[in-house]
């Protein structure tokens, strides 16, 4: 199982390297001691920075939220250029469309934090003494990162990223039809 996990991290190496960069940046900003910064290692932390446990809510939130948000935003940006051309329009002739499609999948497959970071998030934000309003506000984010961190342990985030890339142009065109109409007029 570890070999499959490492293979998917290598296949999505651009997103893997960028996620380790974001995690390393958060460790540097928050002063979290880092044990191993290698992006590619043959264990369950492949694609993650191995660091000490976070000490407070701010560190934990940043460790889970910043890499997730940055990779998700980049994934959406690249999928707008790649998946829209390939999946929605059906333009199979452009090399940039395929490149953007691959980069979008790579970033989407590497959004979620490690399972240990998610459990740390749960310990800090869902303990008995935590604010109820904060628990409610963070519930959707926690559900997403918890569910996808479990999928990541079994290398299923790659499959989920492909499904997201295929569905993304249709969902986007449904939510923002004006943007799609303008882009079709300009094409």
PLM regions and their residue ranges:
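Short hydrophobic helices that act as membrane-entry/anchoring signals
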Residues: 1-16, 23, 27, 134-157
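Metalloprotease/metallohydrolase-associated module, dominated by Zn2+-dependent proteases
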Residues: 36-38, 46-180
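Short, strongly hydrophobic alpha-helical membrane anchors
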Residues: 182-187
